[in-house]
Swiss-Prot record:
Propeptide: 1-10, 18-34
Gene Ontology terms, MF aspect: toxin activity
Tissue: Expressed in basidiocarps.
The keyword Signal belongs to this UniProt entry's keyword annotation: no
Species in which this protein is naturally found: Amanita exitialis (Guangzhou destroying angel)
Family: Belongs to the MSDIN fungal toxin family.
Name of the featured protein: MSDIN-like toxin proprotein 4
PTM section of the record: Processed by the macrocyclase-peptidase enzyme POPB to yield a toxic cyclic heptapeptide. POPB first removes 10 residues from the N-terminus. Conformational trapping of the remaining peptide forces the enzyme to release this intermediate rather than proceed to macrocyclization. The enzyme rebinds the remaining peptide in a different conformation and catalyzes macrocyclization of the N-terminal 7 residues.
Cross-linked sites for Cyclopeptide (Val-Pro): V11-P17
Amino acid sequence: MSDINATRLPVWIGYSPCVGDDCIALLTRGEGLC
């Protein structure tokens, strides 16, 4: 993980009420989009 991803991680957790596999999937998709 880069510093950018580490910084975005808490943002994703706060943005998504469901913390778990769904968030991991969103993070994976986000990295794919970037």
